Regions:
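Exported/periplasmic cell-wall-interacting domains
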Residues: 23-25, 81-149
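N-terminal signal peptide c-region/cleavage motif recognized by signal peptidases
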Residues: 16-17
Length: 149
């Protein structure tokens, strides 16, 4: 089986889930291995700082090609912003779609979609914890527990 990693390049500080937590990691890269449902935070020397199990979009096989396909994108992206008004705990927007994604969608005559994030659980549902890993439930985002984000 071909591994299709989803790679995010970032230099942002990944903040703890509560202000009182002392643990903070500075990651140079985040790699998501879709087929393994695994996300790794790497330092500038590509050493793994931390690894997480993740849930993906409800239709995770293959690259995202259009809006509404419930797929998680594959490619190189950046963390473009934090979304303080999100319905999900501490969401980080990624820079999907990039130029290549837009060109591929235009060639197919479809909208590429957007609003892809790395986030915790739905607000008010943090109690679910690792139970969210039982199935892929996002619309294309990458989900971890609230404690992990």
């Amino acid at each position: 089986m071909r591994l299709s990693p989803f790679i995010i390049l970032t230099a942002l500080l990944l903040w703890p889930s509560d202000a009182g937590s002392a643990e903070q990691l500075v990651a140079a890269k985040i790699i998501v291995f879709k087929s393994e449902r695994r996300m790794e935070l790497l330092d500038v020397k590509s050493k793994i700082l931390k690894a997480y199990e993740v849930s993906l979009g409800g239709n995770p096989e293959g690259p995202k090609s259009q809006q509404g396909d419930s797929r998680t994108p594959e490619g190189i992206y950046k963390i473009s912003s934090r979304n303080p008004g999100s319905s999900y705990h501490l969401s980080l927007r990624i820079s999907y779609p990039n130029r290549q994604d837009i060109a591929e969608a235009e060639a197919l005559g479809v909208a590429p979609g957007g609003d892809i994030f790395i986030h915790g659980l739905t607000n008010g549902r943090g109690f679910l914890g690792f139970q969210h890993l039982l199935y892929d439930w996002t619309d294309g985002c990458i989900a971890v527990t609230n404690q992990e984000i």
